[in-house]
């Protein structure tokens, strides 16, 4: 009997939610061609699963990724989401990026953001990559790596 990617993820998450005494409905979709596993969680206490700035959700996603990729020949990308958290967080970060860029232009001083995971740092970099006046770069070591927004020097692209 071949255990599917969905089965592995479902089994693992069922065990986690049982241990947490949480009632969670899972919607799982696996794209065989793209090697992408999408898991959407629904339930009453999703705030607990999201955690502070999505850290719990990110950890859960990382663990599911370890489980489904353990004996897999191809790398499977895993996304775990609930209540459109990922989309809302992306919008929040894009707005933050624009506000910080404005602050940097006004004050003419660099601004360092709070530490973020690679995915969130990439959102900030992307949001400001076409800005004429500011540039972004990451500094520090994980898990304290963060984005710094700086005023471009004259002629810098």
Q: Where are these predicted regions, by residue range?
A:
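RNA-contacting regions in translation and RNA-metabolism proteins
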Residues: 1-157
């Amino acid at each position: 009997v071949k255990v599917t990617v969905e089965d592995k993820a479902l089994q693992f998450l069922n065990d986690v939610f049982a241990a947490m005494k949480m009632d969670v409905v899972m919607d799982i979709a696996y794209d065989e061609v793209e090697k992408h596993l999408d898991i959407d969680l629904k339930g009453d206490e999703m705030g607990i699963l999201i955690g502070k700035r999505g850290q719990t959700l990110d950890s859960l996603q990382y663990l599911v990724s370890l489980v489904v990729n353990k004996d897999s020949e191809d790398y499977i990308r895993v996304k775990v989401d609930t209540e459109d958290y990922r989309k809302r967080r992306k919008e929040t970060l894009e707005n933050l990026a624009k506000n910080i860029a404005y602050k940097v232009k006004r004050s003419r001083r660099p601004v360092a953001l709070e530490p973020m995971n690679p995915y969130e740092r990439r959102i900030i970099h992307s949001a400001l990559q076409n800005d004429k006046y500011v540039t972004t770069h990451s500094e520090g070591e994980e898990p304290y790596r963060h984005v710094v927004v700086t005023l471009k020097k004259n002629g810098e692209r």
